[in-house]
Amino acid sequence: MNDAVRLCIPALPLGDALIELGRQSGLEISFPPAAVAGKVSPVVRGRFPARLALDQMLEGSGLALRAEGANRYLIYVDQPDPTHASRLDPVRVYGEQLGERVYSRQEIATTPSSNRDLSTLVATHPAVRTNPGAHGAQNRGSLDIEDISFYGASPYQNLFQIDGIDATNRVDPANKNLAQVGGNVPSNPQSYFIDASLLEAVHVHDSFVPVEYGRFNGGVVDARLRRFAGENHLKFDYRWNTSNMTRQRVSPGQENKWTQGEPGFTPRWQKRFYSVVADIAVNDKAGMVLAMSHRQSRIARWGLSADDAGKSLRTPNNYRDRIDNFLGKFSVRPDADTLVDLTLKYSDRSEALTSNTARDTQYANNHGAYGLAARLEHRLPAARLTLQAGWDHAMSNRRSTSREWVTTRPYRLPVYFKGGFGREQKQQDTVLLKGRIDLDPLRARAFTHNVYAGIDAQRIDAAFKRPKLSTAYTRTYGSTGGYTDSNRYLWRPGTVRARSQTAALYLSDRVEWRRLALDAGLRYDHESLFGSHSVAPRTRLDWDVLGSGATVLSGGWSRYFGGAVLETALEARRLRLLQQLTDFRGNPVPAGKQDFAVDYSGLRMPYDDEWAFSLRQRMAGLEGLLGYVRRDGRRQWIKSGKINTGFTYRNGGNSTTDAVSLTLRTLEPWRAGPTRWHLQVSWSWQKRKTNTDLAKGYDDNARGPNDRVIYNGAPIRTIDLPPRSFHQPQLAALTLTGAYPRAGLTWTHTLNWRGRRDDIIYVGRGPGPSFLDRYQSGGLPSYWTWDTRLSWQPPPVMPRLELTIDILNLLNRMPAIVAGNPTLASNNATYQSGRELWLQVGYRF
């Protein structure tokens, strides 16, 4: 049966799911009850050939199928051990919708990786761009998570979810400043730093994004937790890497910072990762999956102190960077029509730092979250109802033991700094309720309607907290030993809050007529803090050219409204906790001159308009997809002003991105003798114009249409200046995974290619009378890297033992990836990280 059919099958016991598939598709499926006992089928929802849906249901089950005639199949137990990691099962690609990419558990397990975070996993996606320095050698020992941008949209306007529950930081995600500054708390767009090896799958939506997703401009990254599969299992993994197993190249201009381990640089480290995953049966209707991991890196840094004579002295020590995860999902199926999931999530990252420029100054930057969620799926007579509820607490804080920051000016000796600002924290508490109903297909004459509707309500309570008073001042010594204090500031204790409530309604109908299908959706959002109302259409027209699902032309227009950044509302209230007592001469400063103002009146939600077109072709066991996407970003948030005159936020940012992509992948494994092979190839090209800097996010001011700069010696419009961040014109990736089940081997090769690009370097002001900003291009060549992973489970000896080796950048290519500034005396370019070796051992009970 090659004709595509519309299927809506929830996660069910495998036997029930196969019966339901036969009922909806007309297939005759036979299977022994013992073979499917204790196994659960994934959700199958969408329009595709029923035979392909059957493959999706059997993925990872240890079962295979054999054709017994027209539309008749027999399910039987496959001979290779289904728990064997090297067994290469079919890739789950058939159920993917246009604009969606699913990273399955099997793909995650076979992908060469370093820190196993979500950003690294999706970095080779054709729609995704990272900042150029993300692959650099200068900070390879860190466990920090890189930001990602979809189609030139803000990296701080993506939607991150865990099992459909929002896991996005809405407070101050763009702050990357690691320095000790009062009121400064670095953060990240992802509330949870999830270990990808603990997940069942990661769903990425980059275009044609369905109407149920809102509050984003860029893309959607939805991490799915594992659900109990019917059998008791326990798996341990230990993984390690050190700086001695990693080649690094650092430019002369950065060598001093790198050698001393200044924050943002890591010269020497030892990484140790531990993880445990347990599948536990409660009874024949209930079970749970508990997944835990501890990732740590011990980093050598040099701290500044003083000897007995008061002379500066640098001493080395080790500082820990760690991430802890705990993920739990309890699932119960009281009957064939009902499924209930209860989920617990916990993530905590702590990075201990020391200053190499301030004496006796140690501090820690922390980023963590924990939450609870519940999900109910219930089959009604003519529909399926899904209800979700969630609560999450997320925070970022900076802690130092000292609450006094002193700038000391000794008599005829160098100035030095010392101290800290105690504890300062930004946080958000999120309560979310969601409901959705999917109606069974409705047939009216020649048309078939597939309708679903839903509600999405969310409340975010954001806060900035400073528990205790901190002070900052300058102490200047005279020739007699006396001193005077000036520039005294009080960072007063307190808590400031802001609340944002959003409510959304959405409706979608897929209307099918002959070989045409129209997806028409509409989403309405209301946000309370900024008083924003938005209506977002989502449309897509599909033409099944041959009527078999093999050749599909698609095109559509959609609008994606972003979410609020609550730092804009917290900023003025936070600044009012700061009080200046004396000026730089030591004279008192009247309180009336310290009215900090932030104006965000009239601010509306930013949005991206998307025009997307694609051609999908399936033949000979392969699927190819050619796509074009145009994104017009409008009403992006910008910031202007100074602290002494007040800040103003406005909707002044605009961007335009054109993107072309081509992907090719196998639908089923290629078989060569006893081996099986999967292939995934992608290439993408992007061109972007913008009047803001993506890396600065909502803190950047916009450049006007008539503003001009000097670029390579010639004046041009500022809008024509090439992008400086999150820009890589061409990317390509090839992943080939092979398995030899009899020998217990799995071998993955990934080739990554980055095309040449021009880096943009600021080189100062031009001549008068205009004094325009001057920029110069720095040409960076194209280059390849080769990553590989080899896993071995010795079947005759210890089939449950797994040994893995990852080698990243096998050929040790280390070109410049960020150009150096030609005006500096020494080269300060950033280079690609070199060959990197990871070793891993795992055991499954």
Name every feature range the model reports, one short phrase each.
Residues K329-R349, H367-F530, A659-S684:
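Face-selective signature of the C-terminal outer-membrane beta-barrel domain
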